[in-house]
Regions:
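Metallocofactor- and cofactor-centric catalytic cores in central/energy metabolism, strongly enriched
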Residues: 1-114, 128, 136, 142, ...
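Short amphipathic alpha-helical segments
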Residues: 34-35, 131-133, 177-178, 203
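Short, surface-exposed basic-aromatic patches at helix termini and helix-loop junctions that form
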Residues: 38-42, 134-140, 156-158, 179-185
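Short, hinge-like loop/turn segments at secondary-structure boundaries
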Residues: 66-67, 94-96, 157-161, 207-208
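Short, well-ordered secondary-structure micro-motifs
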Residues: 89, 152-154, 176-177, 201
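Active-site histidine-anchored catalytic micro-motif
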Residues: 114-121, 126-167, 173
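A conserved active-site cap/scaffold subdomain adjacent to cofactor or substrate pockets
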Residues: 142, 159-225
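Internal helical hairpin/lid segments
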Residues: 200-290
Length: 338
């Protein structure tokens, strides 16, 4: 990390009060904790981790629905981390241990010919094009995809924030121009994932805040273009439609999710009778819902590092060690303490 950049941030921050900046990308959260960026920032610059982990924000009911579907005898598949997320009664891996046909995949190509299998689709705009490919191939999908900009707008109505570090990979899909059209009343900087890139984004945000400028700066222009990935956007538009979506800890956010356009490929509709009586209950001691909103830090959860570890997660935030705030904090906090 460049000391001159750290010094420049300190110089700007000297004449400012408390500044609350939120990153909303699991990759950014990983970099922040791995390299201890909070420790090199002035004390009045607070860096808050937001809902950047798709596994973490997937609702309890969606997980319970997939467990119920698997236990009923329907073959299901999903990406690796999702099978370990605890549901009300069990996780998908628990259902697998009871004999359910649950397949963990690393690529959609592993199941693109399996017409009888339901894919549990989770992720932000970055992974949505792969689900679009499955739908085009006639694979049934239980769609829990989330769209990031509406969630960020919702956060500004709930808590005091001074600026956003926008997600780089999401921005590469949707394009930098989208952020300026989303009615988010805060300065935003699209950033890469290296420590110096994040520090530079913070420096630009402080300049914008100091100058009272509410605009979007693309500081990752080698990857993110104004119109984004138009091929991926077209694939999504041809197979999916915007819908209201439930986020863990944030409730229902209008038009923040996606659903298959074809009702014959929408597992929520196909198996609606199976899902209608599901009663989902979250662990009352788990604070994952507050953590994804940036209201508390992982170590403020009473379960963190005691009964809740990556080997035995009690909540979704402890599952993904690449994007989950609790799993990342446990991983690097533990390594720093050793």
């Amino acid at each position: 990390m460049k000391n001159t950049l750290i010094d420049d941030i300190a110089s700007l921050a000297r004449d400012m009060g408390e500044v609350r900046l939120m990153e909303v990308c699991g990759g950014h959260t990983n970099t922040v904790m791995r390299y201890g960026l909070r420790d090199v920032l002035p004390k009045n610059i607070r860096l808050i981790s937001g809902p950047g982990c798709p596994v973490c924000v997937t609702s309890q009911r969606d997980i319970d629905s997939m467990v119920e579907l698997a236990l009923s005898g329907v073959p299901v598949a999903t990406y690796g981390d999702m099978i370990n997320v605890p549901g009300t009664k069990m996780s998908l891996v628990d259902a697998q241990n009871l004999g359910a046909d649950v397949r963990m995949v690393y690529s959609i190509d592993q199941i693109i010919d399996e017409k009888d299998r339901v894919f549990f689709a989770v992720g932000f705009e970055t992974t949505t094009p792969m689900t679009a490919k499955l739908l085009s191939a006639g694979i049934k999908v239980f769609c829990a995809h989330k769209v990031m900009p509406p969630a960020m707008r919702a956060l500004t109505q709930e808590m005091r924030l001074d600026g956003f570090i926008d997600p780089g990979h999401v921005s590469a899909i949707i394009g930098s121009d989208v952020w300026g059209r989303m009615d988010i009343p805060l300065p935003q900087v699209i950033s890469g994932f290296k420590p110096d890139q994040l520090l530079h984004a913070i420096f630009i945000l402080l300049q914008l805040i100091q100058n009272k400028e509410v605009r979007v700066v693309n500081d990752y222009s080698e990857i993110v273009f104004p119109n984004g990935n138009t091929i991926a956007q077209r694939m999504i538009k041809e197979t999916m439609k915007p819908v209201d979506a439930d986020w863990r800890g944030m409730g229902t956010i209008p038009l923040s999710g996606l659903a298959p356009i074809d009702p014959l490929l929408d597992a929520r509709l196909i198996y609606a009778d199976l899902f209608k009586d599901i009663v989902s209950v979250e662990n009352p001691a788990c604070r994952c819902g507050e953590i994804v909103r940036g209201l508390v830090e992982p170590k403020q959860c009473p379960l963190f590092g005691t009964v809740c570890t990556p080997e035995h997660p009690q909540g979704a935030c402890m599952v993904s060690d690449s994007e989950g705030a609790c799993a990342i904090a446990y991983k690097y906090g533990k390594s720093l303490a050793e």
